[in-house]
Structure formats: structure tokens, C-alpha cells
Amino acid sequence: MSRADEIFIQNCKDILTNGTWDTDREVRPKWDDGTPAHTVKKFGVVNRYDLSKEFPILTLRRTYWKSAVDELLWIWQKKSNNVHDLRSHIWDAWADENGSIGKAYGYQVGVKHHYPQGDMDQIDKVLWDLKHNPASRRIMTNLYTFADLSEMALYPCAYSMTYNVTGNKLNAILNQRSQDMLAANNWNVVQYSVLVMMIAQVSGLVPGELVHVIADAHIYDRHVPFVEEIIQNEPRPAPKFTLDPNVDDFYKFTLDSFTMEGYQYSDFSGKIPVAE
């Protein structure tokens, strides 16, 4: 069993057994038919993934890792807020007629800020600090800009990363305000694991731990049967995920720079509804 499978099963069982339902109050999300999308949740879930040991991708069901990485590059490398720059259509529901999601995600990454070393955006400052001041305890990014929230199609769910160099390892903490466990949990874990691996490689470091801190880890009411089915599936060993070792520039990574070997997963044919 992969560590990602083990953590997912533990989280979901805990939420379903010990979680709190919000059926006693009004909620913002709705299903396609207009019905309120209620959830059962746990507060303050913390998961640790040791990237030096294995790549944390689910085998209980397939995670479309190439689409997840494409979205990662869209945000952190292209710094785009336009869905036309994405291969998938995941974000289409939140885009305007021009394909924009407003001042969200990639837009925030690309905003330049003034530092003593010069003007840099968030990811470039991380890369600069890791090269020139790896002992710093101030290496972080934050996409939750209050002044711009009114111009975002969707408030950032995974919103901040804190990077820390310990020895020759790059560790990171991902803070997430809200997590749809079925639809997006492993998607986000895969993305930010890859981001840590990319940054580590171009900074002359090796990947360490990704610590995922989730404020509100929830399962939607209509997702419960799917979750109950998936956590009963047969888990398999974690596959091997590698980056092209010749890439030494963060902006030179492409989808072809990543390889997954031996990825086996259980079949799952359910059509998962998404609340908006």
C-alpha cells in the first residue's frame, strides 16, 4: 500500500466516523439541480508525505497526474489566469467569456513585489532565496490577497507554501483553507509534491517532506457512497516518479520533463458530481 493510500483511507474513515455535518445551516455550494451541497468535515487535518521515500499518488483510484501537473505549470510557471492556457477544462465553469478567472492563482504568482534585491514575483523570490539565502525562515508564497478577493472567480483553496531547507533537503508546508477530499485531495498533493521536486532540483537540493495542513477537510453528501467504495479498493505500491535530471531552470520544465513508471491503480467508473 502506498503512503498516499494509507493517509487517504485514514482521513476519509475519520471524517465519515467522527466528522461534523453542516446540515443544520445554510451553505454556499449547490449541486447542478440547485440542492444545497452539504458536507461532513474534520477541522485541522495534518498529513505528512516524505518525498524522499515515495511519490504520494493514490492507487485506490486513478489520479490524472499529467493534468494535475499541467495545472501546476499553468499557475506557477506560466503565471496565467486564463483557462485557454490549460489543456483540461477543469476551470471552465469559473471563467468569464474571455477565459479569465480574474486576479486568482497564476495572476497572484506573477505580481512583482519590491525587495532590497530588486523587484520579483513570488516564485522568483523563492528561487532567489534558495540560491542566495537557504537558511532563511522567510521563504514562502501566499495567493490569498485580501485586496483582490472581490476580483477572483474563486478564492484560493490551497493558498500558501512555506519552504524550509534542512541539511540538503527542501521541505514545505502547504496550507489549504478548504479541501474536497474526493475530488481534489490527491490532485493537490500530487501537484505540490511535484512543485517541491522541481524547486529542489533547480536549487541543488533534494526533496524532503511535504506537510499538508487542511483547515476544513470535507466529504460532500453526494460523494459519500463513492468514498465508501474507493477506500475498499485494493491498494498497490507507489509508482516511481522522476524529473528530467538535465533541467536546471525552473522555467524549462515541460510536461515531457516528468515520467511515471509502474503506476497501477484500481478501476473506478463513478461519475463524481462537482458542487459549485
Q: What residues fall within each predicted segment?
A:
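Terminal, non-catalytic protein-protein interaction segments that mediate quaternary/complex assembly
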Residues: M1-E276
